[in-house]
């Protein structure tokens, strides 16, 4: 919590102090937050570090995300009705959540793959959070939902990501 507060108030510190804190945050505290399952904190620490370490690139990511916002909204509006219809038909108690990749994460992918913003395709993800009817049958219900969704959208044949999730 102290580190997050320090990062949120970093602008009031001397640049030499900022540089030291940003380095520690990006290489020690953000990975630690990730290991502890504190994803929101990890993401905020990374983005704040990115903002101070690479201010021009950070601003460029924000500008690109703003510029592509309408396109993402259209994709959500086009993509989700069929999912809602299938889940409603199955009687699933669910919630759909859109997740936008963070500026730092987008920039990292661009650096790693040497690609422009327009070629980063995983900027938007839709999550289905459902409440299982019966805890004993939760895995079976996951497979039923998966089966229903693969009737609408064909699975991506690429191997699962490092976090062991698959995409449709």
Predicted ranges, named:
Residues 3-168:
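Nucleic-acid processing machinery
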């Amino acid at each position: 919590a102290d580190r997050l507060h320090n990062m949120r108030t970093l602008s009031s510190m001397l640049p030499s102090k900022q540089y030291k804190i940003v380095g520690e945050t990006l290489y020690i505290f953000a990975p630690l937050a990730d290991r502890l399952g504190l994803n929101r904190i990890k993401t905020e620490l990374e983005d704040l570090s990115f903002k101070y370490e690479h201010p021009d690139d950070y601003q460029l990511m924000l500008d690109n995300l703003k510029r592509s916002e309408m396109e993402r909204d259209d994709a959500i509006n086009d993509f989700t009705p069929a999912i809602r219809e299938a889940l409603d038909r199955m009687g699933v108690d669910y919630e759909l959540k859109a997740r936008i990749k963070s500026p730092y994460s987008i920039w990292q992918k661009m650096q790693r793959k040497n690609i422009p913003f327009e070629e980063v395709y995983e900027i938007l993800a839709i999550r289905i959070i459902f409440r299982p009817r019966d805890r004993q049958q939760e895995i079976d219900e996951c497979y039923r939902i998966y089966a229903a969704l693969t009737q609408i959208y064909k699975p991506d044949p690429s191997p699962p990501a490092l976090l062991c999730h698959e995409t449709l």
